[in-house]
UniProtKB/Swiss-Prot annotation:
It is found in: Cellular thylakoid lumen. Monomer. This is Cytochrome c6. The keyword Protease does not apply. The gene is petJ. Belongs to the cytochrome c family. PetJ subfamily. Binds 1 heme c group covalently per subunit. It comes from Picosynechococcus sp. (strain ATCC 27264 / PCC 7002 / PR-6) (Agmenellum quadruplicatum). The lineage of its organism: Bacteria, Bacillati, Cyanobacteriota, Cyanophyceae, Oscillatoriophycideae. One of its GO terms (biological process) is photosynthesis. GO terms for cellular component: plasma membrane-derived thylakoid lumen.
């Protein structure tokens, strides 16, 4: 009986340690958020207001706070930018849910890191 309990506890501990996180960003859902909220200025990864500040990987590395200095992952830096805005870009925190922001950040990171723009 003790052996069975030990095995069960080991299995449960493994599931909790390596299981799926409570919330994983969804790039496919982020594509929908992007189309509805971002594409007016950022269609195709471009920037209609500041043409040099595109969503392409090389551009993001030069201007995106937190990402350019390595203190944040690309997704974290994009989520921060979307939430708080900067310059001509409005803040979407409060207008989009945290899940929508995480999803759109995952979408933008996927597009940039895989040269899909």
């Amino acid at each position: 009986m003790k052996k069975l309990l030990a095995i069960a506890l080991t299995v449960l501990a493994t599931v909790f340690a390596f299981g799926t996180p409570a919330f994983a960003a969804d790039a496919a859902a982020g594509a929908q958020v992007f189309a509805a909220n971002c594409a007016a200025c950022h269609a195709g990864g471009n920037n209609a207001v500041m043409p040099t500040k595109t969503l392409k990987a090389d551009a993001l590395k030069t201007y995106l706070a937190g990402y350019k200095d390595g203190s944040k992952s690309l997704e974290e830096a994009v989520a921060y930018q979307v939430t708080n805005g900067q310059g001509a870009m409005p803040a979407f925190g409060g207008r989009l849910s945290d899940a929508d922001i995480a999803n759109v950040a995952a979408y933008i990171a996927d597009q940039a890191e895989n040269n899909k723009w």
